[in-house]
């Protein structure tokens, strides 16, 4: 039961964090990001926010620095938007699954080209 609640809260947090980052965080270092998942602990005390960033490695690093700096602001905005007794501690992590999927897709396309 707790696990289902964590999933529901995680989905709502995903939407809210995207809105906060896109509309409220004014740091120019924050690039074009996509939040792919929010993984909450069962007690809702910690949240890993998985995201991808469009851009070079420097832009990715700058975006993560800006998000770490804005973490307190994002957490306070979440607290005002969501009805939670305790707002989870946020940890931003780069989601490598998109890159991995693109790499596999390219390998499959290369195999199809070789077969022709």
UniProtKB/Swiss-Prot annotation:
> Could you mention a single GO BP entry for this protein?
maturation of SSU-rRNA
Which keywords fit this entry according to its UniProt record? Cytoplasm, Ribosome biogenesis
Question: What GO MF annotations does this protein's record show?
Answer: ribosomal small subunit binding
InterPro entries the UniProt entry points to: KH_dom-like_a/b, RbfA, RbfA_dom_sf, Ribosome-bd_factorA_CS
Gene Ontology CC entries for this record: cytosol
Main location class: cytoplasm
Q: Report the subcellular localization.
A: Cytoplasm
Question: What does the record give as the function of this protein?
Answer: One of several proteins that assist in the late maturation steps of the functional core of the 30S ribosomal subunit. Associates with free 30S ribosomal subunits (but not with 30S subunits that are part of 70S ribosomes or polysomes). Required for efficient processing of 16S rRNA. May interact with the 5'-terminal helix region of 16S rRNA.
Similarity comment: family membership: Belongs to the RbfA family.
HAMAP family xref list: RbfA
Record's subunit section: Monomer. Binds 30S ribosomal subunits, but not 50S ribosomal subunits or 70S ribosomes.
> What name has this protein been given in UniProt?
Ribosome-binding factor A
Q: Which organism is it from?
A: Staphylococcus haemolyticus (strain JCSC1435)
């Amino acid at each position: 039961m707790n696990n289902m609640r964590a999933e529901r809260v995680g989905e709502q947090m995903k939407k809210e964090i995207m809105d906060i980052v896109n509309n409220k965080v004014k740091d120019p270092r924050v690039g074009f990001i996509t939040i792919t998942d929010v993984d909450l602990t069962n007690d809702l005390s910690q949240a890993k926010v998985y995201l991808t960033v469009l851009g070079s490695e420097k832009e990715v690093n700058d975006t993560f620095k800006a998000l770490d700096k804005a973490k307190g602001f994002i957490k306070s905005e979440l607290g005002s938007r969501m009805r939670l007794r305790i707002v989870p501690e946020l940890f931003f992590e780069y989601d490598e699954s998109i890159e991995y999927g693109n790499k596999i897709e390219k390998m499959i396309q290369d195999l199809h080209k070789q077969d022709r």
